[in-house]
Design a protein with these regions (language model features):
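Bacterial N-terminal signal peptides
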Residues: 34-43
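Sec-dependent signal peptide cleavage junction
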Residues: 44-57
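Acidic/aromatic-lined carbohydrate-recognition and catalytic surfaces
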Residues: 59-250, 261, 268, 272-320
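Conserved alpha/beta catalytic core and glycan-binding cleft of carbohydrate-active enzymes
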Residues: 177-178, 183-184, 188-214, 291-435
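Active-site groove signature of glycoside hydrolases
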Residues: 253-278, 367, 372-379
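Loop/helix patches that line or flank the sugar-binding groove of alpha-linked glycan CAZymes
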Residues: 373-376, 387-514, 520-525, 559
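Beta-strand-rich binding/interaction modules
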Residues: 524-547
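C-terminal beta-strand-rich structural cap/linker in extracellular carbohydrate-active enzymes
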Residues: 551-568
């Protein structure tokens, strides 16, 4: 949702140094003749570090870097953001106890901002008996492992000073079985006589959950020492809340007000597909209720919901009127982005998918904001899906960060962290900051059976390597921030320039348009812009694997394998 206010934020791009690619050609392309390649090398400086528009500030040079200048970036003051998902326990430890905390996140805001992220999603921070904290024991507090409510308030203030939106996980589908509400209800049930009915006036908390004398299905678990069962879809330690109850809603409204007052800019609604199983109408009503309540507290409030389903179901949930749903159609090893990055999904099909989302989602909510992502805390890492192929990992990141809406990047994706196996603990490993400095290093979650998973080096190593995955992400995020049309523009397929190997999409926001051209194959592609009516546009920026520039001869651009070109 566009706002009129604008805030300035200068972000630094990565510095590229040439490095030869590793991939072997695997797809058809119209290749430039040798003499043309030589001409482009001479005229366009093919292989040199790319350049951005000039500002007064020039980056300092380190060993192996090339001097370059940067364009000042103006971030629109709206809910289109580049989000960084953080599992606090595994991110950065500020006090030496080997558990990440809120102050650790605050200490890494320079890094997060420098990367080009303009939003942060914190996985649950509320008190909980488990390491992941999706089973809450107090909706109005911070888990002592992570810090205090004042630590959160300061973090929110620090984010606001940097124009970074801070959202938190809001798991309202269930509580912990150790929550005082559930404990009180179970104690009451244990005192009932055989056959005696529940009296909610005697114990209001008995109405907060779904209790039954019958074990209605496998998701119902016995209340010890009673004839009663309770619903817990995920497991027995997470009893489902009865979200139909007004008393429950009043409790959750108190929680929402608490976090908004502390400085949260939005909520990620966990497990929204399961508020009531197979009841889209009820679930969307719950989302609408919570969103409307939060908007009363903060007119700029943002909400993104977890609807782990396909495009058509996600479209139905946009009928709630809430702004964003995670786009699971794009995510995970078999999602469209990773498949395209490894050459198993055509460039044209990817553009067709963009148009399809736009049509389906906007029909339900004209102010929709897509929430694309590659992976999250419940999925394997992108590097695993791509068998640690550095070029493919970069390409996947480039595709994600040129999608419309608000992309979400899971911490560690920017350095190619890995997480083999099916255990959730293995997907939430300690952030790999340095090989030589243990400061801030956390322990892996208890139960994880593998150590740090990265074939590409730590943050420290990759920062000094201009062609690293990290610096590729920095360039991609910077390109996104320099061109607000990428996130906000209405998409139109450039039919004449859409093939299996390459494709172009036009993005229009207000009176400004850009074109995004993708070459997802391993081979160079010669693309005649005139065929798509784009010949009047100039190259605005590019993403290439090793810092190559995209050459242009009259109306023809020569795109290296696995590259993205922005035209304006």
């Amino acid at each position: 949702m566009e706002k009129s206010g604008m805030k300035k934020q200068v972000l630094r791009p990565g510095i590229k140094k040439p490095e030869s690619g590793r991939r072997i050609g695997s797809g058809p392309a119209r290749l430039l003749p040798v003499f043309c390649i030589i001409l482009l090398l001479a005229v366009c400086g093919y292989g040199a570090a790319d350049t951005a528009a000039q500002t007064e500030e020039t980056l300092s040079r380190e060993e192996g870097e090339t001097e370059r200048t940067e364009r000042e970036i103006v971030i629109p003051d709206d809910n289109y953001r580049n989000y960084y998902e953080i599992f606090v326990a595994s991110f950065y430890d500020s006090d030496g106890d080997k558990t990440g905390d809120l102050n650790g996140v605050a200490q890494k805001l320079d890094y997060i901002q420098d990367m080009g992220f303009t939003g942060i999603w914190l996985m649950p921070v509320m008190p909980s008996p488990t390491y992941h904290k999706y089973d809450v024991t107090d909706y109005c507090g911070v888990d002592e492992e992570y810090g205090t409510t004042e630590d959160f308030r300061r973090l929110a203030e620090d984010c606001r000073e940097r124009n970074i939106r801070l959202i938190i996980d809001m798991p309202i589908n269930h509580t912990s079985s150790e929550h005082p509400w559930f404990q009180a209800a179970c104690e009451y049930l244990a005192g009932l006589e055989a056959g005696e009915e529940i009296d909610e006036e005697a114990c209001p908390y008995a109405g907060y959950y779904h209790f039954s004398r019958e074990q209605e299905n496998e998701t119902y678990h016995p209340v010890p020492g009673t004839e009663w069962y309770y619903e817990g879809v995920f497991w027995s330690g997470m009893p489902d809340l009865n979200l139909e109850k007004e008393a429950v809603r009043r409790e959750l409204e108190k929680a929402a007000s608490f976090w908004i007052e502390l400085g949260a800019d939005g909520f990620r609604m966990d497990a929204a597909l399961h508020y009531e199983e197979n009841d889209t109408a009820f679930n969307t009503e719950v989302l609408r209720w919570m969103y409307d309540y939060c908007l009363q507290q903060n007119p700029d409030f943002y909400m993104v919901s977890e609807i782990w389903a396909g495009e058509k179901t996600i479209a139905d949930y946009y009928g709630s009127g809430t702004p964003s749903m995670f786009n699971f159609d794009l995510a995970d090893a078999e999602g469209k982005l990773i498949k395209a990055a490894r050459g198993k999904y055509s460039a044209e099909s990817l553009v067709d998918a963009m148009i399809s989302y736009q049509e389906d989602f906007s029909a339900r909510n004209p102010e929709w904001i897509d929430a694309p992502f590659l992976t999250n805390h419940d999925m394997g890492r992108t590097a695993n899906a791509l068998i640690s192929d550095e070029n493919d990992v970069k390409m996947a990141g480039g595709l994600l960060l040129t999608m419309g809406g608000s992309p979400f990047v899971y911490y560690g994706e920017e350095i190619g962290m890995r997480s083999r196996g099916t255990k959730d603990e293995n997907k939430r490993l300690s952030m790999y900051w340095s090989d030589t400095d243990e400061t801030g290093r956390t322990l892996d979650p208890t139960g994880a059976d593998e150590g740090i998973g990265s074939a590409f080096g730590s943050v420290e190593e990759q920062l000094s390597d201009g062609t690293s995955i990290l610096n590729y992400y920095r360039r991609a995020l910077r390109l996104r921030n320099e061109n607000p049309e990428i996130a906000r523009g209405t998409a139109r397929k450039v039919e004449a320039l859409c093939k299996e190997q390459y494709a172009a999409v036009l993005k229009t926001w207000g009176d400004s348009s850009i074109a995004i051209v993708y070459n997802i194959s391993d081979e160079e592609a010669e693309i005649d812009l005139k065929e798509g009516g784009l010949e009047e546009m100039e190259i605005r920026g590019s993403l290439t694997l090793n810092g190559e520039e995209i050459g242009r001869t009259q109306d023809v651009i020569c795109m290296p394998g696995q590259s993205v070109c922005i035209l304006k």
